[in-house]
């Protein structure tokens, strides 16, 4: 890696991690398509997932080392802020497409669906049971991670941030496990009409984002334990909080629209 002493930014050296992450994401996408067409693809998806995790870990490790060396100036951190904001905006557009699909079919059901929504034969989940508990988990986790951030800004590096992060990680993990339990007990699958397809795509991709956010929180917890954050320099943790709040907002919208409003209850 080279750095020009007269430049506000550094120029990273060649890195293989973006290439491996792209290949892994492509492999997981192909595996998902094959699985939806009832073609065995667990080996491809498993290998792609392992490669994705290892590549992401290595990429984050190099990025953290660059910051520890001193390459992350305030101009670089500002560019990171802009990039994370644009990344979250792209994620908003990603979920917007699925919500659009849901509204297109819910507001104007086709003849194939019996002009009804939910379609006949679909027993939708009760919004006041499991999903309400999941909503409480994510809202509580958002409050705890915000309190952890507030404690860090007040130069409390001992109790406040640790408790907030640990509780948030536990809430995210429990949310994912409860979501899997709900999938197990649902009376319909992803192949049962457009409702099943959109429901599992929305909740499934949101669950994947919960997993990513939980891993990011774990990385932030380890970095906090190693003393890599300060009250002024902790953008990695701050970006994680942005992402987690985005996950919270998406779930609240999903619960209100999919479970409550158009859930048939």
UniProtKB/Swiss-Prot annotation:
It comes from the Eukaryota. It is found in: Mitochondrion inner membrane. The lineage of its organism: Eukaryota, Metazoa, Spiralia, Lophotrochozoa, Mollusca. Belongs to the cytochrome c oxidase subunit 3 family. Its EC number is 7.1.1.9. It is a multi-pass membrane protein. It catalyses: 4 Fe(II)-[cytochrome c] + O2 + 8 H(+)(in) = 4 Fe(III)-[cytochrome c] + 2 H2O + 4 H(+)(out). The chain crosses the membrane at residues 16-36, 40-60, 83-103, 159-179, 198-218, 241-261. SUPFAM superfamilies: Cytochrome c oxidase subunit III-like. This is Cytochrome c oxidase subunit 3. Component of the cytochrome c oxidase, the last enzyme in the mitochondrial electron transport chain which drives oxidative phosphorylation. The respiratory chain contains 3 multisubunit complexes succinate dehydrogenase (complex II, CII), ubiquinol-cytochrome c oxidoreductase (cytochrome b-c1 complex, complex III, CIII) and cytochrome c oxidase (complex IV, CIV), that cooperate to transfer electrons derived from NADH and succinate to molecular oxygen, creating an electrochemical gradient over the inner membrane that drives transmembrane transport and the ATP synthase. Pfam families: COX3 (PF00510). Component of the cytochrome c oxidase (complex IV, CIV), a multisubunit enzyme composed of a catalytic core of 3 subunits and several supernumerary subunits. The complex exists as a monomer or a dimer and forms supercomplexes (SCs) in the inner mitochondrial membrane with ubiquinol-cytochrome c oxidoreductase (cytochrome b-c1 complex, complex III, CIII). One of its GO terms (biological process) is aerobic electron transport chain. GO terms for molecular function: cytochrome-c oxidase activity. Keywords: Membrane, Mitochondrion, Mitochondrion inner membrane, Translocase, Transmembrane, Transmembrane helix. GO terms for cellular component: mitochondrial inner membrane.
């Amino acid at each position: 890696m080279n750095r020009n002493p007269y430049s506000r930014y550094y120029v990273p050296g060649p890195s293989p991690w973006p290439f491996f992450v792209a290949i892994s994401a492509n492999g997981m996408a192909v595996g998902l398509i094959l699985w939806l067409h009832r073609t065995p693809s667990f080996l491809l998806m498993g290998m792609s997932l392992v490669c994705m995790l290892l590549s992401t870990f290595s990429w984050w490790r190099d990025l953290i080392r660059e910051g520890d060396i001193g390459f992350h100036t305030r101009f670089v951190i500002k560019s990171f802020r802009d990039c994370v904001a644009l990344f979250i905006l792209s994620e908003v557009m990603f979920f917007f497409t699925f919500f659009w699909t849901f509204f297109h079919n819910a507001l104007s059901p086709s003849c194939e669906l019996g002009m009804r929504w939910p379609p006949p034969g679909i027993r939708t989940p009760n919004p006041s049971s499991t999903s309400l508990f999941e909503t409480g988990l994510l809202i509580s986790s958002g409050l705890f991670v915000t309190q952890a951030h507030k404690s860090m800004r007040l130069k409390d590096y001992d109790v406040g941030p640790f408790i907030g992060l640990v509780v948030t990680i536990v809430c995210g993990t429990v949310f994912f496990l409860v979501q899997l339990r709900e999938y197990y007990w649902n009376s319909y699958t992803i192949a049962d009409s457009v409702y099943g397809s959109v429901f599992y795509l929305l909740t499934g991709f949101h669950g994947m984002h919960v997993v990513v956010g939980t891993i990011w929180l774990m990385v932030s917890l380890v970095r906090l334990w190693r003393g890599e954050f300060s009250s002024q320099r902790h953008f990695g943790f701050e970006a994680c909080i942005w992402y987690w709040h985005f996950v919270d907002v998406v779930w609240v919208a999903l619960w209100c629209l999919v479970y409550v409003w158009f859930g048939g209850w």
